[in-house]
């Protein structure tokens, strides 16, 4: 790799490589997919406070891209495993790269701290696979009292399209619930642009997809 995008450099991974006049440029589009999916639902991460559950690949990409795109505060919660240490390393990088974004990392075994951080957050993100088929009966949030009318709840899980987390958040009256299927679409849109230099006909794709799901 000759160069890396800011997100790829901070994360230390790429999923899209573009040859620009003989120079190989590495990009990471997962976080872009998340941010653009939110924008597609009328939500901008700029100026927002987020709580992200998980510290795996998808959660890390989301954390980094949201910081780069202007989030003011990100609280990461993960079990006490090697991913927790990696999250702390990423947070340290972001402190240098994006000093205006306050990134903190917490262990998930402190439900009181999790509730406290969600109470201060604008957006709650499930960046784990909890709730993915065949475990649709699971949710990363067991205390439904954290849901409130002005909280936006997002899930990276795309199957089912509405997870238990999103369903319970909606039933509790949360402002918006956003599933993970759109994240897949928008990271593909970003990759399409990088590969071709053209804008992907997103609305045509959405129409085609809707017609073929009937």
Segment roles from a protein language model:
Residues 152, 156-214:
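Adenosine-phosphate binding glycine-rich loop
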């Amino acid at each position: 790799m000759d160069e890396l995008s800011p997100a790829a450099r901070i994360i230390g991974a790429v999923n899209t490589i573009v040859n620009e006049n003989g120079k190989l440029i590495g990009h990471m589009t997962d976080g872009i997919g998340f941010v653009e999916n939110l924008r597609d639902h009328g939500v901008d991460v700029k100026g927002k406070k987020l709580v992200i559950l998980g510290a795996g690949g998808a959660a890390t990409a989301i954390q980094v891209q949201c910081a780069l795109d202007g989030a003011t505060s990100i609280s990461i919660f993960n079990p006490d495993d090697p991913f927790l240490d990696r999250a702390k390393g990423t947070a340290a990088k972001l402190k240098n790269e994006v000093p205006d974004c306050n990134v903190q990392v917490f262990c998930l075994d402190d439900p009181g701290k999790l509730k406290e951080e969600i109470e201060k957050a604008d957006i709650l993100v499930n960046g784990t696979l909890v709730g993915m088929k065949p475990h649709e009966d699971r949710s990363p949030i067991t205390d439904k009292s954290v849901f409130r009318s002005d909280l936006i709840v997002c899930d990276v899980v795309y199957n089912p399209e509405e997870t238990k987390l999103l369903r319970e958040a909606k039933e509790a009256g949360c402002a918006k619930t956003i599933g993970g299927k759109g994240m897949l679409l928008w990271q593909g849109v970003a990759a399409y642009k990088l590969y071709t230099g053209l804008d992907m006909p997103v609305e045509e794709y959405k129409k085609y997809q809707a017609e073929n799901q009937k």
